[in-house]
Amino acid sequence: MKKLLFATCCIAFLSASLGAAAQKKSVAKNVLTQTLNGKSWSADNGNGTFTNPLFYDEFSDPDIIRVGEDYYLAGTTMHSVPGLVILHSKDLVNWEFSSYCFDRFDDSDDFNLRNGKEAYGQGIWAPAIRYHNGKFYIFSNINGHGLQVYISDSAKGPWTHHKVNGDIYDLSVLFDEDGKIYAVHKYGNVTVTELKPDLSGPVEGSSKVVIPEGNAMGEGHHVYKINGMYYILSADYSPMGRMQCARSKSIWGPYETCVISERESYGYAAGWSVGNMGIGRPLPEDGFSFQNNKPNGLNLGCATIHQGGIVQAPDGKWWGVSMLDFNAVGRTVCLSPITWVDGWPYFGLEKNLGRSPRTWFKPNDMVKTPQAPYDRCDDFSGKTFKPVWQWNHNPNDKMWSLNKERKGWLRLHSMPAKQLLWAKNTLTQRAIGPVSYTSVKLDASRLKVGDEAGLGTINTPYASLGVVKTDKGLNLRCYDQNTNKEVWKPLAK
């Protein structure tokens, strides 16, 4: 599912004002950053139970599989690179990083923040992860570049990839028992298409709308074959985020449908929204007047769990993963017990079907010590970035260095930018809820007049806290794009 707003991130950035760039013709400035220690959220309560969400940060469009005793989870990464993240778990609660499927997007203006183009809220999204005949497959769409498939012998990579032809998007994939491969895809009109064995594209003439629009099956499909029945899970948004399930004895239908989860927000309310921003609109200039909409207490919107998939544990029990929108943190992943009633996989427990417990018993006790998927602290002494880091759009690799130009430091060279959202080589982490604290050690001694370096949150509106070099020296600048207010404070020499 494509996001209307991009996720909030914690960032380190460096930019030069356009005015300074125009005056100097060249801006090859340096900034040095180094992080300090911090902590991260874990869903494991340490007593045999867990509390949702699994990750208190953005991880949207989750899709899950099990291979033996190992679980694998794939999620959307949009415009951030490296992209298409895969996590691994033994108990569905404690997760660790496995790999990214690719390092960067192909060269283009939008993915490079070049010539006034950008890819916020675009990029790669809604992955489908599958395991078949000893290989892992990840199917996902890149805006403007169509459907891609990434293939590896291991979830740790390396991954090879090629484009899959055809008008196929927001899909799930089924490797059927008879050797045929099916894609369930599109929004509204749920469509089934048979894929060629080499995954080069669709079998000609095979596409069929199996559930017409208006039958409460929306998007973000997940397809399974269970005990001879075909099941399709979808996210629907009328009147608010919920999960639907369709089933049939044939992949081609006819299908009957059932609501399997609705109105489950774990007590959270819908957050504030911006009414005059979204996909397809220009990025807001500083001074833009944002239309901030107060949430409607009667409509939870997407603050309820909606899109996700299901998986069977080795002990025969079933579990579901889904996402819910949690204010500026983004879309968080939740784990639910699945209760089968009359052949339908309901999220939740018996006598309370469709409503998932926020705290529940872990699927197993294979992991004794609670752990978070990422180590979020970095002293930049390694040869590569820790996997928690992603670039905002493609980086310019000539304008940064890690532990090379200065040992134990990340060095960012400034490039012209109108404001934070256009700053290239911005290094990001997803913001952690419910509250985040970030510390950074920054050497600003080599900033030139017009340069700015620091931290910020990437969203619309954005906010930043940075050190600015003027002809009078260094200043601390705090800017809130929502209110268009800024505070300047001179720094002591």
Mark where each language-model region is.
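Carbohydrate-active catalytic/glycan-binding domains of CAZyme proteins
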Residues: Q23-K493
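Bacterial Sec-dependent N-terminal signal peptides
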Residues: M1-K25
